[in-house]
């Protein structure tokens, strides 16, 4: 029953992020900034704050399970890089990393969580050329997110003392967190697809 409750709460947190994604994707300002190929520093800063806020929200709504917090940080951080590019991914994840490091309820995991949050944003930014303009394949995005979450588990083992604490936590949370977050980012990213479709339609008419 405890495991079912954790999974249900994680699904609710993912649903919250998807709801936010659906809402902000309707704003013309957000559409314009994401569709821009050459963004100004001001535009990148704005997107960094938007996606960084989602990473902070994911930390704040994390589900406590003993010494760790089951969370959805990977969704906002990776989406920042995939949709906004390397700079947006870097600074959005930096905002999230600073927050989790300073305000994490579980200081034993603070360094590992901050490091992995940065990694999520950089990983998304690194794959930005491949995923941009809505041309991504969902199975590739799913596997990329699974890889990111596995790296997160490695960070827990690397930076957490004692190691036994990290290992016990990983055994408890790894499978649901990996699979649900990987599925969640597919729905999150798909919320922005209509922008790219509309842009392609407009270009075909020109």
What is each of the regions a protein language model found here?
Residues 1-26, 48, 62-72, 104-206:
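Membrane-embedded alpha-helical hairpins and interfacial helices in multi-pass inner-membrane proteins
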Residues 23-38:
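Membrane-interface helix-loop junction between the first two transmembrane segments
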Residues 37-52:
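Loop-to-helix transition at the N-terminal end of transmembrane alpha-helices
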Residues 53, 70-78, 94:
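Hydrophobic alpha-helical segments embedded in the membrane of multi-pass proteins
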Residues 55, 96-97, 117, 149:
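Residue-level recognition of pore/gate-forming positions within transmembrane alpha-helices
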Residues 73-89, 123:
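Generic transmembrane alpha-helix motif of multi-pass integral membrane proteins
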Residues 84-85, 99-104:
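Interfacial segments of multi-pass membrane proteins
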Residues 86-91, 134-138:
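Membrane-helix interface segments
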């Amino acid at each position: 029953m405890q495991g079912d409750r954790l999974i249900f709460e994680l699904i609710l947190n993912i649903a919250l992020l998807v709801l936010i994604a659906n809402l902000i994707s309707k704003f013309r300002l957000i559409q314009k900034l994401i569709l821009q190929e050459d963004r100004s520093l001001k535009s990148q800063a704005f997107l960094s704050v938007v996606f960084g806020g989602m990473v902070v929200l994911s930390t704040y709504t994390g589900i406590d399970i003993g010494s760790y917090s089951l969370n959805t940080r990977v969704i906002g951080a990776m989406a920042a890089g995939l949709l906004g590019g390397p700079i947006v991914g870097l600074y959005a994840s930096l905002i999230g990393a600073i927050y989790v490091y300073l305000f994490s309820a579980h200081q034993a995991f603070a360094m590992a969580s901050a490091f992995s949050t940065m990694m999520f944003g950089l990983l998304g930014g690194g794959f930005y050329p491949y995923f941009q303009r809505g041309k991504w394949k969902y199975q590739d995005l799913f596997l990329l997110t699974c890889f990111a979450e596995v790296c997160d588990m490695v960070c827990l083992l690397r930076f957490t003392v004692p190691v036994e604490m990290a290992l016990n936590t990983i055994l408890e949370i790894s499978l649901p967190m990996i699979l649900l977050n990987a599925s969640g980012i597919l729905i999150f990213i798909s919320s922005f697809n209509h922008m790219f479709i509309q842009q392609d339609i407009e270009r075909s008419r020109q």
